[in-house]
UniProtKB/Swiss-Prot annotation:
It comes from Acropora millepora. Residues 151-253 have a biased composition (Low complexity). The keyword Signal applies. Component of the acid-insoluble and acid-soluble organic matrix of the aragonitic skeleton (at protein level). This is Threonine-rich protein. It is found in: Secreted. GO terms for cellular component: extracellular region. Keywords: Secreted, Signal. The lineage of its organism: Eukaryota, Metazoa, Cnidaria, Anthozoa, Hexacorallia. Residues 141-150 have a biased composition (Polar residues).
């Protein structure tokens, strides 16, 4: 029992000593802060003899900050600095340049980062310091405007030439009708029966009123052939076609009633009775 109590007391003593001793991480952080402060003090000592000229601006990006940049005269002992703070709320990086009396590199110790972090949304904050005039000024490189050469593609309107071809080709299609009109008079040489058809061709010129093309009037030469109809006295012979009544002799096939003999169907009918529609045959039903 005594051994157990002694072990417990020893354990408690070790816990107290461990908790009271400073952690190694804290020791390293304090050493780093001290090193940073000594470096900044050295920078301030080197620059206190002159007033630096620094760039001053603020923007959501480095380019926006550089576009609104202006030169300012710093107070004695101040250096040129650049702060880059990431705003977690808006998802943007705020870039600030100007003159600051820097006391530390952490956002909590730096007055510039502290001023930006009034809302508490700054996730990270980095700062850069230098001790020469305009050492924190930004630069812009704008080479992209050379892409304006693409506007030379305005030559495309030259494609308006094809429509002129379509308009000139259409009138050429009016020439074939003149050939058709010249062929009709050649048909007057056959029998006078064909001459009766020629007057019917005079109806075709009436269709020439629809086309607006001026070439259609060239068909007016065909009416000059109307002098040939003076031979229309011959059409009195057109009565001869009445001889076409001769085909009325076609009833000769009526001699087919010869097969008056009954026609027997050797197959069994599907029904009890039937009707055969042919006038030349009789349907005889067989039972059994």
């Amino acid at each position: 029992m005594k051994a157990f109590l002694l072990s417990l007391a020893t354990l408690l003593a070790c816990i107290v000593l461990t908790e009271s001793a400073p952690h190694s991480a804290d020791v390293r952080e304090e050493a780093f802060d001290a090193l940073v402060r000594s470096y900044l003090q050295a920078v301030q000592r080197d620059s206190h003899m002159e007033n630096l000229t620094c760039a001053e601006c603020q923007g959501v990006t480095e380019r926006n900050c550089t576009l609104g940049e202006r030169q300012v005269q710093c107070n004695p002992g101040e250096v040129c600095t650049t702060l880059e703070a990431f705003n977690l709320d808006t998802g943007t990086t705020t870039v600030t340049r100007g003159c600051f009396n820097i006391t530390g590199l952490n956002c909590g110790d730096n007055p510039g980062c502290g001023a930006l972090n009034t809302t508490g949304n700054i996730q990270s904050c980095d700062q850069f310091c230098c001790n020469t005039s305009l050492c924190n000024a930004g630069t812009l490189t704008t080479v992209t405007p050379q892409t304006t050469d693409g506007n030379t593609t305005t030559e495309a309107p030259t494609s308006t030439e094809p429509p002129t071809n379509a308009s000139t080709e259409a009138p050429t299609s009016t020439e074939p009708p003149t050939n058709a009109s010249t062929e009709a008079p050649t048909s007057t040489e056959p029998p006078t029966n064909a001459s009766t058809e020629a007057p019917t061709t005079t109806e075709a010129p009436t269709t020439t009123e629809a086309p607006t093309t001026t070439e259609a009037p060239t068909t007016t030469e065909t009416p000059t052939t109307t002098e040939t109809p003076t031979t229309t006295a011959a059409p009195t012979t057109t009565e001869t076609p009445t001889t076409t009544a001769a085909p009325t002799t076609t009833p000769a096939p009526t001699t087919t009633p010869a097969p008056t003999t009954p026609f027997f169907c050797n197959a069994t009918l599907a029904g009890l009775s039937g009707t055969f529609t042919s006038p030349n045959f009789q349907l005889i039903t067989q039972t059994g």
